[in-house]
A protein has these predicted regions:
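Alpha/beta enzyme core
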Residues: 2-56, 61-83, 87-178
Length: 178
């Protein structure tokens, strides 16, 4: 048996995660984020089922902006739960969402680069890619800092970049390095 590890506390909207706080329940909508009413209704059903936070996909800037309308619709229905924006492939959508929601989930494997099989990078090109990714991430970090928005880094095997796949393969090390 492993000793119990007490993590630090993270504030997500009106909820605290970690420390001695209870495990929090989160789910994700499957509605089209452009359908505001359907997404608000699904969020309300999730809250009524016990969710304390709801994740909503924001594939583009339009969907990221719609998060404000979803948040407003939830507030009108008496639900002020933390919303989480789920972002893939679109750093600008993440930046827009970070000014609206309480938490942004990004995947480093597809935040700013897509998978292109067969690409092998030299050490110099690999390091240039890392710097390019860092440059794309800095504006998001600044917006999150200004708004008190939490960032969740979520990685999985299905979204490792070419840079990672060619260096580490589809391995746990690749997920960590991602």
């Amino acid at each position: 048996m492993f000793p119990k590890y007490i993590s630090g506390i993270v504030q997500v909207g009106n909820l605290q995660l970690g420390g001695y706080n209870p495990i929090r329940v989160q789910s994700m909508t499957y509605t089209d984020t452009n359908d505001i009413d359907a997404t608000v209704s699904q969020c309300v059903r999730l809250v009524n089922a016990g969710c304390e936070m709801v994740r909503v996909t924001a594939q583009g800037i339009t969907e990221a902006n719609n998060l404000a309308l979803i948040k407003k619709g939830l507030k009108q229905k008496g639900n002020e739960i933390p919303l989480i924006a789920d972002i893939h492939y679109n750093p600008r959508a993440a930046e827009v969402a970070a000014g609206i929601v309480e938490k942004v989930r990004i995947n480093p494997g597809n935040y700013s680069d897509k998978y292109s099989p067969g690409i092998i990078l030299t050490e110099k090109a690999y390091n240039e890619e890392l710097e390019r990714i860092a440059d794309r991430l800095r504006p998001l970090l600044q917006i999150c800092r200004q708004n008190g928005t939490v960032i969740r880094i979520g990685t999985n095997h299905g979204s490792l970049s070419s840079r990672i796949m060619n260096r580490y393969g589809d391995t746990p090390e690749g997920m960590v390095e991602s």
